[in-house]
A protein has these predicted regions:
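N-terminal/domain-start segments enriched in small and hydrophobic, helix-friendly residues
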Residues: 31-41, 61-85
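Extreme N-terminal starter segment of soluble prokaryotic enzymes
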Residues: 1-4
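Conserved GNAT-family N-acetyltransferase fold
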Residues: 49, 59-61, 78, 83, ...
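Conserved acetyl-CoA-binding loop-helix of GNAT-fold acetyltransferases
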Residues: 82-104, 245-257
């Protein structure tokens, strides 16, 4: 009989081996990724669920504490990702049973990136489609294409201290302004609490760089990745007002200047809001790949996702998924 359970610290080595087999494309990073994950807080390990039989894992799902604002009201929840059940068990509905177990443990969960079959299961369990995230790619300066070949990731020390005397590079978490209120009262906006921000963007696992506007309190986070041997810059996360296009246009302009300063030809950005779509497309960005669905709680039915996307007021604003960039997805 297959058991569904929360794992313990002593089972971490077994979890690492299961992930090596399940996600071979992660290569030697598997242990580092899981170690990074469980280092977030004392309960991080127990928020990992597994399908287990006779001491062997056959499936998993990771949950993480998150919080969001909706209509200005703060609510705690969980984000889930890396849901997988071994292929041979799916015909026996083990995956659905596992998801039902997870729903009992984490009833108010959100997720993104699910494939078509998983989306059907989420919806069958009472969740709803709230929107989607699109991956955009823009060519900022073709002159740097040759110099970015085989260059690798860019170290934090190579980024400028300021951009246009407006954006300041944040060297440590203590320099960050407190993010205690939403930038957009009428949107679904995922919170950026201090514990999350310090763990996620001020770590030694990956060279994230944070820039902040001390006048407005807006910020953005960038990093570099290598795809097809070309180094690109990723606009990974940001917060700003979306009442109009101005604030995000300033962030995008700063990102373009930054890319030119460190000789990067390509910028990658995700969008879960129609306003951001418009700004990116007006700057000749191209949407590539399939839109990644955002799944959430049923009680927000009617609050948001419109298939024509003309007036979408329920949106992640903006949580760009690392999954787009060959890392773990986390919001």
């Amino acid at each position: 009989m297959y058991n569904f359970k929360h794992i313990t610290y002593k089972e971490i080595p077994k979890l690492i081996e299961y992930n090596k087999q399940t996600y071979p494309e992660r290569g030697g990073y598997t242990k580092s990724i899981i170690d990074f994950w469980v280092a977030r807080h004392s309960e991080a390990v127990s928020d990992i669920l597994t399908v287990e039989k006779d001491g062997k894992f056959y499936g998993q799902e990771f949950y993480s504490k998150m919080a969001f604002y909706y209509k200005g009201v703060y609510e705690e929840s969980h984000w889930c990702f890396d849901l997988i059940v071994d292929q041979k068990l799916r015909k026996d509905c083990i995956g659905l049973d596992f998801m039902q177990y997870a729903l009992e443990e984490y009833p108010n969960y959100y997720c993104t990136g699910s494939g078509p079959d998983a989306v059907k299961l989420h919806l069958a369990l009472g969740k709803q489609l709230l929107g989607d995230i699109r991956k955009y790619v823009g060519l900022v300066n073709p002159l740097w294409l040759a110099t970015s070949l085989f260059r690798g990731k860019i170290a934090k020390s190579k980024y400028p201290r300021t951009i246009d005397h407006v954006w300041r590079k944040v060297e440590s978490f203590v320099e960050m302004p407190k993010l205690e209120q939403p930038f957009n009262v009428n949107l679904f906006e995922v919170s950026r609490d201090a514990e999350f921000f310090q763990w996620r963007f001020f770590n030694d696992f990956h060279p994230y760089v944070v820039y902040v506007n001390d006048t407005t309190g807006t910020y953005f986070v960038v990093t570099t990745i290598v795809q097809k041997h070309i180094t690109a810059i990723v606009l990974l996360d940001f917060r700003c007002s979306l009442n109009d296009t101005k604030a995000f246009e300033q962030i995008l302009k700063a990102t373009h200047k930054l890319a030119n300063k460190i000789y990067i030809p390509i910028v990658i950005c995700g969008s879960s809001h129609t306003l951001i779509d418009r700004v990116l497309e007006s700057n000749h960005y191209i949407s590539i790949g399939r839109p990644r669905p955002i799944i959430g709680t049923k009680k927000y039915k009617g609050a948001g996702y419109e298939k024509n996307k003309k007036e979408q007021d329920f949106s992640r604003c903006t949580c760009i998924s690392d999954q787009f960039f060959n890392h773990w997805e986390y919001c």
